């Protein structure tokens, strides 16, 4: 199980990441584009995914971890429960979301160092 502090630590290790408030909750940005936001409940993370099909697949495969709400219908955005995701998986989710929003050059530099 990860905590808000774990999410913050993992997100802020990604290049160019800053933390700002979005809708009154912590959110993480890369070069001005958000890639993760902690929901008001404090134990759910909002993340973009590559496509709505991937969102549907995550929810169908692991509904204890991933879900959505009507607000996100029609959007390639999934919600992840902190309590159902370990730190390694959360790091992977954040990195994938970061890659979706990061400038291509920054992502390429990151991948070259990995």
Task: Please report, for each region that a protein language model flagged, where it lies by residue.
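Charge-dense, helix-prone N-terminal extensions
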Residues: 1-114
